[in-house]
A protein has these predicted regions:
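Short, Lys/Arg-enriched alpha-helical recognition elements, typified by the DNA-recognition helix
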Residues: 66, 80-197, 209-211, 331-334, ...
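Short, polar N-cap/turn motifs at the start of nucleic acid-interacting alpha helices
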Residues: 266-273, 364, 383-406
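Active-site/catalytic core of tyrosine-dependent DNA strand-transfer enzymes
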Residues: 109, 152, 157, 162-168, ...
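N-terminal DNA-binding module of tyrosine recombinases/phage integrases
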Residues: 29-137, 313-336, 340, 410, ...
Length: 435
């Protein structure tokens, strides 16, 4: 009886095995004690080579599960479609990105200085699998140390070229990268990865879920009225041309490059109008003239004192040209080191000269703070936000001005409140108190 049951059980087991379909082991092969898995993910649009997803497992059943998961990723388009690196993508994106050359140079500095050393050799496929984590980690490291030293001690040499070390070659001290620069790194990466998605190189942008560093609230620090008076007096004492430049910076709030690039044809001393239509910037060691920061010209009305100061400045320039038996043409620069005013001033030299003058006065400030001074004085004086934004050259109809100088609007609001109240009859209960 027991023998008959054993034969029946064996027969049932054999028949059950025959009814089971053979296991699909496509893409799986056994090598030694492990199973290797390879799944085709199409062809690389950049190199034209076939893309393969690979993995390994210790058992056949685990290999089948992994193979099916890789197939699902290919089917759902959640894998990168190219094996190129992030560095290659950044180069391709930057070469065709439509921006001004000065902006392109700043992007290139960010890429070569901070992004490429950290993630440049990482394949896009790996970054897509890891999601936003590598990028957020990079941002955190840069906010701790711009050199990403990870606590490693080393000497920061004064130049990468062969040299003899002196006191300028000192031990590394961690300096965080500014939040604005880290946010620019994020913008560069986001732009490049968005382009990769448009080009079909990747199907998901890992930065879509990344959290970029928060921008701290602007903290403009203009000089006080007393400090401004000291600065203006010191500039006039040095020489009249330098005093004119500092004065014009005070009253117009123009950017450094805008004043350095100013030509006489832009200064209408009869109508008292100053036209800002270009800016002088430094690029690759040379200076070039370009559009203003917002790519918009603006016209600033000048007061009578400023018209007189600029007229005297022009008379001095005309006299210098007369000494050279030439005339002062309208296309020459308003501020120049050359007697004929054909050569502009060095913007960096102006910044250094101003910094030294302020330091000699014991004032901790910088040239751009004069722009803040102009804005805050206008707002505190009750000038409307749109007018201030127009004089400063802020885009957005005053949104930027409001964001930067919000703290100074309280004074203007107080004056507005007093103005309205002064034009209304007071109730009898307070007439006597304020009489």
């Amino acid at each position: 009886m027991s023998i008959r049951l054993s034969i029946n059980a064996l027969y049932a087991a054999v028949m059950a095995r025959r009814k089971q379909p053979p296991k699909d082991l496509t893409g799986i092969r056994q090598r030694g004690g492990t199973y290797q898995i390879r799944v085709s993910a199409g062809y690389d649009p950049v190199t034209g080579r076939q893309l393969m997803l690979s993995d390994s497992a210790d058992t056949e059943d685990a290999a089948v599960l992994i193979r099916d998961r890789l197939r699902e990723q290919v089917r759902d388009n959640t894998t990168a479609r190219t094996n190129v690196t992030l560095g290659y993508l950044l180069d391709e994106w930057l070469s065709g990105h439509q921006v001004e050359e000065t902006t392109r140079d700043s992007y290139r500095l960010l890429i070569n200085g901070f992004i490429r050393p950290a993630l440049g050799n990482t394949p896009l496929a790996q970054l897509c699998r890891q999601g936003p984590r590598p990028f957020e980690q990079l941002y955190a490291e840069l906010r701790t140390c711009r050199r990403r030293c990870h606590g490693r001690a080393f000497v920061e040499h004064r130049t990468p070229r062969p040299h003899t070390c002196d006191e300028r070659c000192a031990g590394h001290v961690c300096k965080p990268l500014a939040v604005s620069s880290v946010r620019q790194c994020h913008a560069v990466l986001s732009g490049a990865l968005s382009a990769a998605k448009r080009w079909g190189w990747i199907t998901l942008n890992p930065l879509d879920a990344a959290q970029r560093p928060r921008m701290p609230a602007p903290q403009p620090d203009p000089p006080s009225a007393e400090e401004a008076a000291k600065i203006a007096n010191a500039a006039w004492e040095q020489d009249a041309d330098w005093g004119t430049f500092v004065w014009l910076t005070f009253v117009t709030g123009a950017r450094r490059g805008e004043l350095v690039g100013l030509a006489w044809e832009h200064a209408d001393l009869v109508s008292g109008l100053l036209t800002i239509r270009r800016s002088l910037v430094r690029r690759n060691g040379t200076t070039i003239l370009k559009d203003t920061k917002t790519h918009q010209m603006r016209v600033i009305k000048l007061d009578q004192d400023t018209i007189m100061i600029l007229s005297q400045h022009r008379e001095r320039a005309e006299q210098r040209c007369a000494d050279l038996d030439t005339t002062l043409d309208d296309d020459t620069f308003v501020f120049s080191y050359a007697p004929d005013h054909r050569r502009h001033c060095d913007p960096d030299a102006i910044t250094h000269r101003y910094a030294k003058m302020a330091a000699d006065l014991g004032i901790d400030t910088h040239l751009h703070a004069l722009r803040h001074y102009s804005a805050t004085e206008l707002l505190a004086g009750g000038v409307d936000l749109r007018t201030v934004a127009g004089r400063l050259g802020h885009a957005g109809g005053g949104a930027t001005t409001l964001k930067v100088y919000a703290a100074w609007l309280a004074g203007a609001d107080t004056k507005a409140a007093d103005l309205i109240a002064s034009r209304l009859p007071r109730p009898p209960s307070v007439r006597g108190e304020r009489s």
